[in-house]
A protein has these predicted regions:
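Intrinsically disordered, low-complexity segments enriched in proline/serine/threonine
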Residues: 8, 41, 67-70, 77, ...
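Intrinsically disordered, low-complexity segments enriched in small/polar residues
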Residues: 7, 39, 57-59, 79, ...
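Intrinsically disordered, low-complexity regions
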Residues: 1, 5, 19, 70-73, ...
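Glycine-rich phosphate-binding loops of nucleotide-dependent enzymes
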Residues: 85-92, 96-335
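Transmembrane alpha-helices and adjacent helix-loop boundaries
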Residues: 1-65
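ABC-family P-loop ATPase nucleotide-binding domain
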Residues: 43-97, 326-335
Length: 335
């Protein structure tokens, strides 16, 4: 219940004797104003405001790593005590299968994701792309086949163990903690590769800096972020674990042209910094400009694998997206 000062309450009471029901109108207006200006609630709006007021200035606050620590924080692709081959496959899948009852969602898929590349995983809806990612990072167990990462077998490992080996992941739908700050959301991803809270916060802020959210936005409440900011926050959360391989599941979904170009630029820079990227996406015009190689799934099977210029012309790929009947009609019209 909203409490009024004695003077204001007395004035409303006097006004209520002149205009019956005016108190309800005032309360209604107050509620509408709060809903419009602070939909998350007054407490969380004040909390965000205070967080911004007390946020350390970039480069001078408690989060800023001292000079000796920068080298250990900035190269997020650093393999945490392991070595990564300079060339060849970083991730290798051999005859990987995952079924749900009688449905083969991933049907004996064999493919390599080479170190240092941006690898696109494409296919129509229901092709098995996200299921493949879920099998790679341990959310789902493979029924058969083998998965190796930098020479280490991942088959059968739990998600947190896969993450510790150096694989980060984003998801189709961003699951933020809406009443926590952006920094607090990202710190959660940093704990897997840190030994203290202070180190986790440094890793998180470095990751936020890489995606352009390190200043005041780091202390904003996550529930008030735009779609682009949510996507970048989740990308930073994955980067905070210092992965060697990033699995991006429709990171470009829901973005306008300018926002999409910004995110593409960030992904390219992450790759130039040494992180291998595998990305699922339906925005083909963006993917063709972004990736080095395509793997195409349809009904769980790998139907094409190669350079973008070759894959987009592949008859099997076109048929998978548009359907056999459309292809036949197109051929008839040409004939």
């Amino acid at each position: 219940m909203v409490k009024l000062s004695p003077t204001l309450g007395r004035k409303l009471a006097e006004l209520g004797s002149i205009i019956p029901g005016i108190q309800g109108v005032v309360y209604g207006i107050a509620i509408i104003v709060i809903i419009l200006l602070a939909p998350e609630g007054i407490y969380w709006r004040v909390r965000e405001w205070l967080a911004r007021r007390t946020a350390p200035i970039k480069g001078t606050g408690a989060w800023a790593p001292a000079a000796p620590n920068v080298a250990s924080v900035v190269p997020i692709a650093e393999p945490r005590g392991q070595t990564t081959p300079a060339e060849g496959p970083l991730l290798r899948l051999q005859a990987v299968r995952r079924t749900f009852g009688g449905l083969r969602a991933v049907d004996d898929v064999t493919l390599d994701i080479n170190n240092g590349t941006i690898h696109g995983i494409i296919g129509p809806n229901g092709a098995g792309k996200t299921t493949l990612f879920n099998v790679i990072n341990g959310f789902l167990a493979a029924d058969s086949g083998n998965i190796t990462f930098a020479g280490t077998t991942l088959t059968g490992l739990k998600p947190h163990d896969v993450c510790r080996h150096g694989i980060g992941r984003t998801f189709q739908v961003v699951r933020a903690f809406p009443r926590m700050t952006v920094l607090e959301n990202v710190v959660i991803g940093a704990f897997v590769g840190s030994t203290s809270n202070a180190e986790a916060e440094r890793l998180a802020m470095t990751a936020l800096d890489r995606v352009g959210l390190a200043d005041e936005q780091a202390y904003a409440i996550a529930g008030g972020l735009t779609t682009k900011q949510l996507r970048l926050m989740e990308l930073a959360r994955a980067l905070a674990s210092r992965p060697r391989l990033l699995l991006l599941d429709e990171t470009l979904a829901g973005l306008g042209h300018d926002a999409l170009e910004d995110v593409l630029r960030i992904i390219r820079q992450i790759n130039r910094d040494g992180v291998t990227v595998a990305i699922i996406e339906h925005t083909m015009h963006a993917m063709v400009k972004l990736v080095d190689r395509f793997s195409v799934l349809d009904h769980g099977k790998l139907i094409a694998d190669g350079a973008p210029a070759d894959v987009v012309k592949d008859r099997t790929v076109i048929e998978a997206y548009l359907g056999r009947k459309w292809m036949e009609r197109a051929q008839d019209s040409v004939a």
